[in-house]
Amino acid sequence: MRLETMKQTPSSPVNIAMQDSFGCAVENRFQQLLDDESDPLDFLYQSAVEVTHRKKKEEGAAKKNANQKSGKKESQKDRKAVVVGGSTDVKVTQQTGQKRAPKNTEKVTQNENVDSQVKVDRTERRTAFREVRPNIMDRSAEYSIEKPMEIMDQDKQMRNYGGRGGMRGRGRGGFPRNTESDNLRGKREFDRHSGSDRARMRPEDKRGGSGPRNWGSIKEAFSEIEAVPVEEQVETTETEATEEHGKVSEETNDDGFSQEMSLDEWKLLQDQNRSKTELNLRKPETSVPSKAVVIHKSKYKNNISENEEESQYCFRKPVNDITAQLDINFGSLARPSRGRGGGGGRGRVRREEAFPHDVINVLADAPNPDDPEDFPALA
């Protein structure tokens, strides 16, 4: 849906020429005009309500201004006029009667007064912004040590930088006005546990010997010595004398001279003086008990030679081991042929081996389970 010119412009040669040369096509894509379903009577009612509210506000403001003027004190000029003219009754009637609404001239004077108050407030704010605040003054007074001259010079240099072309990104001011990083405006201060300027040692503490990192004063040492009673000192001196006398008596000889000895002799003396610990040790019983009885003797124990035992001392063998009595001969076994694949020249018959194949019965007879010699573990 396209809508051409919505309103007709006033007839003028310029407008007519513009309409002929230029055209504008308006397309209502979102159908905003069709969605408006409100009643025009509602709009009229709302506008009337708004007008009444405005009138009430204006009347209330006028009453407040009239009350403020009536509550002001009379100036000296008004008093003189009353005394000279003698028209006190007129004044009373005016005050007791209905309050009149302020005129346009009075409104103008009120606006002028408001403008002057705003100007005064702005000037006061500017002066207050440049003044030093009370919290900064208190903090500077808390330090007992004066600021050194080097820091003062640095502060002056930083202030001189703050001209018109000072640091970029700061506008006209250059450096920030708060040169001291500690005195940040509007932030609380907390005492550091690790130590700060306030926690440092004061000169009074240092003179008196108190405070951290101080070795004390001479007065404290004398006061501690005086506080100890005389009897305790006498007892301590007596105990020290007895201990020293005992040590000297041990080291000295009968003649009263100190004895020189070597390290071994001194160790012997120490061992003699040292208390010895007595241990109740038992020796193993070598004697055979009288009630011991031999159950059976092995058959093969006596046949084993001593030489074989000496040569094979490292291996633990049972008493009835018969492996040493077996005669094993590996010479009767067939030897493999050497060389390439088997043997002699061409066309010859394979010769027989010189060693006969004798079958040797290595295995013994089956053991008898009833005999304890054959089954020693079952006995």
From Swiss-Prot:
Residues 232-241, 368-379 have a biased composition (Acidic residues). Residues 71-81, 118-133, 139-158, 179-208 have a biased composition (Basic and acidic residues). It is found in: Nucleus; Cytoplasm; Cytoplasm, Stress granule; Nucleus, Nucleolus. InterPro entries: HABP4/SERBP1-like, HABP4_PAIRBP1-bd, IHABP4_N. Residues 107-116 have a biased composition (Polar residues). It comes from the Eukaryota. Keywords: Cytoplasm, Nucleus, Translation regulation. One of its GO terms (biological process) is ribosome hibernation. GO terms for cellular component: Cajal body; cytoplasm; cytoplasmic stress granule; nuclear speck; nucleolus; nucleus. Residues 162-174 have a biased composition (Gly residues). The keyword Secreted does not apply. Associates with ribosomes; promoting ribosome stabilization. Interacts with eef2/eEF2; promoting ribosome stabilization. Ribosome-binding protein that promotes ribosome hibernation, a process during which ribosomes are stabilized in an inactive state and preserved from proteasomal degradation. Acts via its association with eef2/eEF2 factor at the A-site of the ribosome, promoting ribosome stabilization in an inactive state compatible with storage. Plays a key role in ribosome hibernation in the mature egg by promoting ribosome stabilization. Ribosomes, which are produced in large quantities during oogenesis, are stored and translationally repressed in the egg and early embryo. This is Intracellular hyaluronan-binding protein 4.S.
